[in-house]
Amino acid sequence: MKTKLNELLEFPTPFTYKVMGLAKPELVDLVVEVVQRHAPGDYTPQVKPSSKGNYHSVSITINATHIEQVETLYEELGDIDIVRMVL
């Protein structure tokens, strides 16, 4: 992934992901499971439903230590079957 994030960020730094996916009960657990593999810690994600209730957005903040960690998490979070978008 070619990004300029490395030029913009100074590591270690807090980094928030916003993951949007289908409103399924397992969404939060799947997001936390992926994050735990690359940035172990205690997480309390914020969950917001869409106006029609079909989707949920899950915001989770990690303490990023390097750009590869940030990029890998973008890719792996996006690979979750019920995830539609990662910001």
Swiss-Prot record:
GO terms for cellular component: cytosol. Pfam families: DUF493 (PF04359). It comes from the Bacteria. SUPFAM superfamilies: YbeD/HP0495-like. Disulfide bonds: none annotated. NCBIfam families: PRK04998.1. Belongs to the UPF0250 family. PANTHER family: UPF0250 PROTEIN YBED (PTHR38036:SF1). This is UPF0250 protein ESA_02696. It comes from Cronobacter sakazakii (strain ATCC BAA-894). The lineage of its organism: Bacteria, Pseudomonadati, Pseudomonadota, Gammaproteobacteria, Enterobacterales.
